[in-house]
From Swiss-Prot:
One of its GO terms (biological process) is translation. Signal peptide: none annotated. PANTHER family: 60S RIBOSOMAL PROTEIN L11-RELATED. One of its GO terms (molecular function) is structural constituent of ribosome. Belongs to the universal ribosomal protein uL5 family. Pfam families: Ribosomal_L5, Ribosomal_L5_C. Transmembrane segments: none annotated. Part of the 50S ribosomal subunit; part of the 5S rRNA/L5/L18/L25 subcomplex. Contacts the 5S rRNA and the P site tRNA. Forms a bridge to the 30S subunit in the 70S ribosome. This is Large ribosomal subunit protein uL5. GO terms for cellular component: ribonucleoprotein complex; ribosome.
Amino acid sequence: MSRLKDKFNETIKPALVKEFDIKNPMLIPALEKIVISVGAGDSAKDQKVLQNMADTISLIAGQKAVITDAKKSVAGFKVREGFPVGIKVTLRKEQMYAFLDKLISVALPRVKDFRGLPKNGFDGRGNYNFGLSEQLMFPEVEYDKILRTHGMNITIATTAKNDKEAFKLLELFGVPFAKGK
């Protein structure tokens, strides 16, 4: 079992039960999944760059990434139906905890002038979204093998009913939030 899953079972669950006065153990907020997604943008036209981006995300996540296609044509964006528009990978169970541990303890501390993740990334239903400007902060990524640097969006889905519960859950996991608002 991963370090964060042990921490969740031993310390975080009891803290959440105490803080929110939860009677039913099935109502304790927990992590559901983590989705890492990248918009391909202009890179979608070059199959080699798109595949390189997918390989990079697969390395970071530890699971094969999927290239997503447009569901319908949009002339304003010069996109046709079936045209590749992004890359995503969904992590659950052990891989989810391993990725979150790597993100918190290795990747985010490597960011220059990192002041914490914004607190306004919650959606009102207990899920948290934030973006990273580049993929080079992860130790698996080798600078020489990257054709183009790109950012990524990370969504942490929880079973929490509201933002307050989700914030406390992520804070107890050790997610570094920005000080202040």
